[in-house]
Amino acid sequence: MNTNNNGFVKMWDNWSKRRSSVPVYDLWLDEYKEILESNKDNEIFDLGCGIGADTLYLIERGYNVLSCDFSNEALKSIQDNIPNSKTLYLDMMKKFPIKDNTYSLIIADLSLHYFDNETTIHIMREIKRILKNNGILLSRVASVNDFNFGAGVGEELERNYYFEGDYTKRFFDFEDINKYFGIIGSVEAEETQMTRNEDEYLKP
């Protein structure tokens, strides 16, 4: 497992500083309204939350959220811009500081596609460990068809996993989805197109 991630953290700190304002979210979680409402009384775990777009979406709708990231700048941005937020420093490359069988719902939005095979497997096992029986992970990852955001660009280090100059990124096909997310349990997946305000979004 590659644990030398100082450069990766620095990159995300810089990215978060450039976007240290109230985050702008899209409405992808609207599709999962029933799942969210069934967790109205539970704390939702926002894994790799960045500056808190999904955190803001959830808090505005009355949900209790723990926002987790390994960028202190991202966590600071959440604390500064989202009232009633709770944050936790968490490095996904290490064991999560969470007890087994804690969460009924975990959200990992565009945060699981930056890691090599070994690390990705580790992360999926950790997610499985902290999920309760019949718990749910809602996640979005980059697709092999995501050509606007780097699919197939750079040095291919592993199948569908590229070094793009400043960082690494994995682009998933359905085989990858089943390989990795299947570690957690049964998988439901679809490929969709995201709509973003490009003024609010910067790579990676």
Model region roles, listed by residue range:
Residues 46:
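Class I SAM-dependent methyltransferase core
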Residues 97-99, 116, 173:
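GHKL-family ATP-binding catalytic core of two-component histidine kinases
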